[in-house]
């Protein structure tokens, strides 16, 4: 939120941005608006100016900022391709009625493999052998029945997906407390899962979801009838979370739906016919949306309960139109958020960041960077060691708003070009570039950041550009690259 009093340079900058946006919104087919002044240069990040930290600046520079990159029918077709062609996406509705023990063991051990490198605890000490033995025993692989009938459930709260059935945090080096190597991802309220195994201590469930299979705390899942689970949210109306996060209203009457965090792109069914005179969990509902959320009863069974989603929260009745302007708007809602490896810290990592942005437009992406980079369902431009530096630089110069740029283990979203540089927004733990003396500066960005792409260094000798593995575009297949840019 802006301060009540703004310094004159800041007022002038905001006025320039506002004027530029006002002009550009007049017509999607109008000539590009006069771009705002970039404002004062900021320290540390190479080439960064004040206005670069606003989505309005980049929207004013973008051609056809209000023209959809994909129409709803094209998004639906792309999602269909994703579900049919991408091996990382799984349809839990198509699981067999009985899963053989050999298949289940293979599914679990594909994930739950102890790393060969040393692991350290939060205290900086090596993980004891006894701790490892206890964690591996908790997999309960020896007790797998000959056949397992999947159960179906809905996630009732934001919950971690873990490599092993444990809350033990482990790290690759002493002193690191951010990159927990057992943290895989997270699931959100209303996500659908198939439960196929339980840990020896009974506290963890091995689940399949559409984009990931991993261990989740048992208290985060409500088990229900298959058809009820798979049919949840199939009919509108809806509210789609369009803010970085939203929260349900606090309610002591029903703690199970009180203050729940809902992340960008989550879509919840609305109980549109809720009687106006009937309070919801002790509160009259005119200032909120009455949404339906899953909860657990005392036996862990699924119940569906009303909850209030205040109208002050950033939501929409449907997925947003996939335009460059709105892509920028959605990405910048995360600006400055702390980096959370595997959705740790209640936040997200680089691939989670772009997934949640595109989810608010109804676009399905794989969970991890490797799967996203290789997905055959998108408009992919791949790179190999045979591609020259010039070829890579030309591809970077042609990036458009929303294009996703992949290097090993990382993804960035293009936001525009200015002064011969391509700029990206990305959720990053690190980042580095060469200083005036030619030495590499290792930055601890550790959050959603805006940086130029060209100066970013992967090592002392390799640029990010040299390590690009692919560029994924949200365009109808076969759409040619546009090379013209706003000056």
Please describe what each predicted stretch is.
Residues 2-15:
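Bacterial N-terminal signal peptides that target proteins for export
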Residues 16-24:
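Bacterial N-terminal signal peptides
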Residues 177-180, 252-255, 313-318, 336-345, ...:
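Second-shell loop/turn segments in exported
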Residues 186, 366-435:
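...with weaker cross-activation on analogous glycine-rich loops/strands in unrelated enzymes
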């Amino acid at each position: 939120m802006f301060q009540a009093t703004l310094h004159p340079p800041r007022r002038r900058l905001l006025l320039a941005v506002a004027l530029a946006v006002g002009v550009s919104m007049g017509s999607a087919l109008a000539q590009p608006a006069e771009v705002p002044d970039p404002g004062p240069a900021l320290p540390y990040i190479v080439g960064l100016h004040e206005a670069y930290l606003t989505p309005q600046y980049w929207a004013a520079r973008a051609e056809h900022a209000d023209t959809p990159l994909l129409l709803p029918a094209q998004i639906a077709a792309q999602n269909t391709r994703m579900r049919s062609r991408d091996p990382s996406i799984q349809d839990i509705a198509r699981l067999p009625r009985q899963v053989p023990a050999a298949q289940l063991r293979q599914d679990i051990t594909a994930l739950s493999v102890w790393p060969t490198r040393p692991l350290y605890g939060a205290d900086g000490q090596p993980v004891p052998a006894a701790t490892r033995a206890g964690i591996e025993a908790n997999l309960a692989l020896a007790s797998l029945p000959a056949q397992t009938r999947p159960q179906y459930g809905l996630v009732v709260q934001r919950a971690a997906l873990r490599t092993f059935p444990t809350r033990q945090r482990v790290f690759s080096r002493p002193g690191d407390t951010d990159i927990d190597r057992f943290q895989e991802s997270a699931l959100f309220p209303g996500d659908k899962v198939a439960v196929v195994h339980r840990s020896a201590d009974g506290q963890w469930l091995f689940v399949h979801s559409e984009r990931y299979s991993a261990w989740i705390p048992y208290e985060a899942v409500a088990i229900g009838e298959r058809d009820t689970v798979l049919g949840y949210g199939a009919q509108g109306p809806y509210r789609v979370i369009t803010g970085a996060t939203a929260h349900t209203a606090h309610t002591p009457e029903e703690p199970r739906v009180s203050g729940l965090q809902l992340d960008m792109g989550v879509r919840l069914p609305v109980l549109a016919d809720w009687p106006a005179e009937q309070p919801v969990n002790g509160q009259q509902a005119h200032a909120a949306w009455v949404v339906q959320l899953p909860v657990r009863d005392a036996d862990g069974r699924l119940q569906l309960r009303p909850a209030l989603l205040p109208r002050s929260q950033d939501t929409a009745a449907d997925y947003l139109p996939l335009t460059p302007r709105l892509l920028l708007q959605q990405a910048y809602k995360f600006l400055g958020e702390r980096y959370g490896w595997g959705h740790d810290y209640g936040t997200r990592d680089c691939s989670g960041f772009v997934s949640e942005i595109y989810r608010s437009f109804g676009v399905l992406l794989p969970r991890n960077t490797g799967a996203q980079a290789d997905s055959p369902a998108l408009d992919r431009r791949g790179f190999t060691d045979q591609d020259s530096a010039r070829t890579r630089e030309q591809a970077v110069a042609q990036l458009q708003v929303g294009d996703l740029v992949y290097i090993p283990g990382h993804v960035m979203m293009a936001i525009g070009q200015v002064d011969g540089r391509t700029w990206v927004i990305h959720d990053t733990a690190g980042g580095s570039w060469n200083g005036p003396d030619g030495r590499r500066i290792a930055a601890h960005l550790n959050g959603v950041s805006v940086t130029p792409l060209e100066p970013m260094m992967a090592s002392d000798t390799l640029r990010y550009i040299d390590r690009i593995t692919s560029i994924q575009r949200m365009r109808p297949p076969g759409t040619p690259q546009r090379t013209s840019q706003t000056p």
